[in-house]
Amino acid sequence: MSTIEEKVKTIISEQLGVKQEEVVNHASFVEDLGADSLDTVELVMALEEEFDTEIPDEEAEKITTVQAAIDFISNSHQQNKSN
């Protein structure tokens, strides 16, 4: 498991108050992990802070699963490295 994946899963677990084992890549924040809209906003803010990146609102709306969060952060880091 990559460092980004581990960090994202840890943040999700802490923010949503769920066990680390429940935070699997295909899990939906709302349907599988019990998040509400405020939880998802706070989660996006925590990811932005941890990874020192900005997630535009239109992108944040698309991040509905653990894998989507991992993919966004990974892609964001790749772009930052190439700049």
Swiss-Prot record:
4'-phosphopantetheine is transferred from CoA to a specific serine of apo-ACP by AcpS. This modification is essential for activity because fatty acids are bound in thioester linkage to the sulfhydryl of the prosthetic group. GO terms for biological process: lipid A biosynthetic process. The modification O-(pantetheine 4'-phosphoryl)serine is found at S37. Pathway: Lipid metabolism; fatty acid biosynthesis. Keywords: Cytoplasm, Fatty acid biosynthesis, Fatty acid metabolism, Lipid biosynthesis, Lipid metabolism, Phosphopantetheine, Phosphoprotein. It comes from the Bacteria. One of its GO terms (molecular function) is acyl binding. One of its GO terms (cellular component) is cytosol. Residues 2-77 form the Carrier domain. It is found in: Cytoplasm. Carrier of the growing fatty acid chain in fatty acid biosynthesis. Belongs to the acyl carrier protein (ACP) family. NCBIfam families: acyl_carrier (TIGR00517), PRK00982.1-2 (NF002148), PRK00982.1-3 (NF002149), PRK00982.1-4 (NF002150), PRK00982.1-5 (NF002151). This is Acyl carrier protein. It comes from Blochmanniella pennsylvanica (strain BPEN).
